[in-house]
Structure formats: C-alpha cells, structure tokens
C-alpha cells in the first residue's frame, strides 16, 4: 500500500513530485467543507497544477456512489484535504467510499492524506477529538478509522495554532503509537515500511 501522509500538503508535496507529475488525481475536499479557514485547499490545487497533474475534484458527501467509483477508478492518485476528521470519516463510511478506496489502494494507487486525510488512516480517530470537534450530526456508533496503518498521525505538531493541543494529545495518549509531524514533514508508506521525510 502506498501512502503519503502530511500536515500541510502544499509545503511538502514537492517531495513526491515524481508520483504526481502528469498523473490523474482525484481531489477530495470533503473534510474542509464545514471549516472556517480553507486556504490550504487552494494551495494544494495550485501545487497539483504546477506539477502538471490532471485534477478531478469530487465531494464524497454529495456525489453519487457511481460517480465517485468512476473518478477513483480513473485516478492514479487519491488526495484528501485537511479539515474535520470526524466529518470526513463519517462521509466515507456512510457512502461506502471507505471500501471503494481500499480496493483502489490494493491496486497500487497512491493515497495522499493531508491533516484530517492522514488522521483517518489510523485504526481509530478518537485521539484527535480535542483538535477536531465531532459534528452534532456524526452518524457512526464508534470512532473507527480506515485502519490502513498501525500508528496514529498527529499533524501540526507544535505548530501554531495547534501547539498546546498537540502537546496535550501527546501526553494524554502516550499509550498509542503516535507519529507527530510538523507542517514541513510527511510520512511515506510503501510495502516495506514507513519513513518520515522533511522539506528544508
């Protein structure tokens, strides 16, 4: 399985430019839809464009399943923006896109997860509730994540405005295998393991 998990994609995406250049990218902004600040979504769009990617944007909370399936099947790369992890995970599970995504990743496609998009890869997303408020209309009975990895990404570590909350999560969830990364770091996962990469 190929994953690139990060806090801020436009700051580190060039580290994997060979994986993105001239490729078909399914761009999923769903996590950001209820957020006040979404500048990172526009920054990501610009970087994909600069790298010559062919981007198809799709909101999994409103699109028909067959449309999502078609976009995912045509994509080389599936990218999830940051935003609210609980809202994103709820939509993935509610629509069946979670299983569709796993099928496509089994074919060797690359998933890029930024912030919320990285958090959802863990076995559970419960650890992030202090950073991401759970929506009132959250419809799942548990806080299961996609369970693609056996660790828990903690994005924006010691980075404003998340300095205090990330420190708190590190302390309170010390029993979890947390992987803290700042906005200049990313985690590359392939069949052989994972490594943290850094943008100077």
Where do the protein language model's features map onto the residues?
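Glycine/Thr-rich phosphate-binding loops of Rossmann-like dinucleotide-binding domains
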Residues: 13, 35, 88-89, 121-122, ...
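N-terminal beta1-alpha1 cap of cysteine-dependent amidohydrolase-like domains
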Residues: 1-77, 81
């Amino acid at each position: 399985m190929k994953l690139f998990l990060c806090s801020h994609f436009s700051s580190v995406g060039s580290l994997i430019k060979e994986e993105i250049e001239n490729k078909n990218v399914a761009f999923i902004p769903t996590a950001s839809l209820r957020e006040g600040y979404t500048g990172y979504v526009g920054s990501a769009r610009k970087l994909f464009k600069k790298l010559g990617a062919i981007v198809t944007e799709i909101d999994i909370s409103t699109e028909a399943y067959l449309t999502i399936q078609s976009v995912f099947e045509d994509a080389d790369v599936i990218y999830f923006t940051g935003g609210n992890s609980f809202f994103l995970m709820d939509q993935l599970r509610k629509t069946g896109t979670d299983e569709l995504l796993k099928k496509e990743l089994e074919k060797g496609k690359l998933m890029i997860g930024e912030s919320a998009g990285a958090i959802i890869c863990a076995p559970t997303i419960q650890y992030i509730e202090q950073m991401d408020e759970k929506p009132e209309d959250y419809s799942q009975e548990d806080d299961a994540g996609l369970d693609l990895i056996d660790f828990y990404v903690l994005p924006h570590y010691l980075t404003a405005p998340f300095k205090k909350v990330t420190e708190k999560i590190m302390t309170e969830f010390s029993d979890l295998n947390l992987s803290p990364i700042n906005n200049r770091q990313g985690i590359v996962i392939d069949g052989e393991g994972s490594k943290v990469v850094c943008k100077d």
